[in-house]
């Protein structure tokens, strides 16, 4: 019985520390930084704990986006699917701003996946305007389907 109790305590402590390692939205994080945080997490998906990169990405998803793609278990399945799986453990990425205002920003993201194939995405973030802990935080509202660009040399 003591062993089971110790194992449960260790599991609880490790999951608490693991989740504490993830960044959370705050109003000082700029639009491009939000995308960089998400992409870096996905690039190193299991570096902190299993699927930590996906959970990091989820933390910066707009509540409206979460309603469409969630709960988190569904979001994980979506990102591991053929449609978006190239984001997981990708080799590199570039982020280029296409346009912005004080309420939204649109970016072109190009990812080189682990099979050395390039994919292009349109990625949009918006500043959250409702009261609460997310007020004035930039959050992802939309990521397009990938457009394959071909392989690298």
Write out the residue ranges for each language-model feature.
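Exposed beta-sheet edge and beta->alpha loop/turn motif
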Residues: 97-153
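Charged, low-complexity intrinsically disordered segments
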Residues: 27-32, 105
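Short solvent-exposed beta->alpha transition segments
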Residues: 48-102
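Sec-dependent signal peptide recognition
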Residues: 2-10
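Hydrophobic h-region of N-terminal signal peptides that target proteins for export
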Residues: 10-18
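Boundary at the C-terminal end of the N-terminal hydrophobic targeting segment
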Residues: 18-25
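Short, aromatic-enriched amphipathic alpha-helices that serve as compact interaction elements
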Residues: 30-46, 60
